[in-house]
Regions:
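Acidic two-metal-ion nuclease catalytic site recognized across multiple nuclease folds
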Residues: 1-3, 165-216, 221-224
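Residues immediately flanking
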Residues: 16, 96, 123, 233, ...
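Acidic, Mg2+-coordinating catalytic module of metal-dependent nucleases/exonucleases
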Residues: 91-108, 134, 138-195
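Core beta-strand-centered patch of the WYL/Sm-like small regulatory domain
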Residues: 196-267
Length: 267
């Protein structure tokens, strides 16, 4: 890929709106994506998603998406494969990729979509290099500077701004249609990865927990309440410095993520 000309590569700007900031616990409520190339071709993907959980008010204040707006929308399971087909042959372009890609990566893993750890190009990093005159590099600030009408903090609008920032960066960089992707990466720097990592052994070894083996745990929630739960571990994951166990929880009758450090006992 590094020797391919920029003109021949498909890019895809992606943005998500979610119920919170932690992909281990929070859910996606909207996906917006724009697939494009330097020749000017464009195609978009957009959907609201029913997260099957309440959207907190403090998050609604950011993106404006309410429970009522998503109650008749498809679930993530209904759209994830079509979304994967849309982005799979593209280089992803994201504003702060580690956030959005971690949500997407975990959803792909849960649905059994075989993909390498997701990575993308970071328009925050690029904006800091090429728009250093701005007071900050938020999408709203960049949109205003570039004369883009973006009044709503919504996924597709933000993906479009992300695409426009990327195209402006290419223009300002001095690269042309004969430049290679490798030359662009020399400007961008190292690609940005999802923060989601699979852990198949470390938690199991330390805590004597095995995938597919039902266990009983004592779990302390954020309020300090301790509950006894029967769980069936499905996967171990790591997000940042925190490790989680993805498991079927018999108490809730659904899949849950348990923070490993909050498990205070195993029977």
């Amino acid at each position: 890929m590094f020797n391919e000309k920029l003109l021949t590569i498909n890019f895809c700007a992606v943005d998500l709106e979610t119920t919170g900031v932690n992909p281990a616990f929070d859910k996606i409520v909207e996906i917006g994506a724009v697939k494009f190339n330097l020749a000017g071709d464009k195609e978009d993907f957009h959907t609201l998603i029913n997260p099957k959980v309440h959207i907190p008010y403090n998050v609604v204040r950011i993106h404006g998406i309410t429970d009522e707006m998503v109650c008749n929308s498809p679930s993530i399971e209904d759209v994830v494969f079509s979304f994967y087909d849309f982005i799979k042959d593209s280089v992803l372009v994201v504003h702060n990729p580690s956030f959005d890609l971690s949500f997407i990566d975990l959803v792909f893993k849960k649905q059994g979509i075989a993909s390498r750890r997701l990575w993308g190009l970071d328009t925050v990093r690029l904006a800091r290099k090429f728009f250093c005159e701005l007071p900050n590099h938020k999408l709203t600030t960049l949109a205003s500077y570039l004369g883009i009408d973006c009044r709503n903090h919504r996924a597709l609008d933000d993906a479009i701004v992300c695409m426009m920032v990327f195209l402006e960066v290419v223009k300002r960089s001095g690269l042309d249609e004969n430049s290679t992707f490798g030359e662009f990466m020399n400007i961008h720097g190292a690609r940005v990865n999802s923060k989601i990592l699979r852990e198949k052994s470390e938690i199991a070894t330390a805590r004597k927990i095995a995938i597919g083996k039902k266990i009983t745990i004592r779990y302390c929630d954020t309020d300090g309440n301790v509950t006894v739960r029967n769980i069936l571990p499905k996967e171990f994951i790591q997000y940042g410095k925190n490790r989680y166990i993805v498991a079927h929880c018999y108490l809730r009758g659904a899949e849950r993520c348990f923070l490993e450090s909050r498990i205070i006992g195993i029977e």
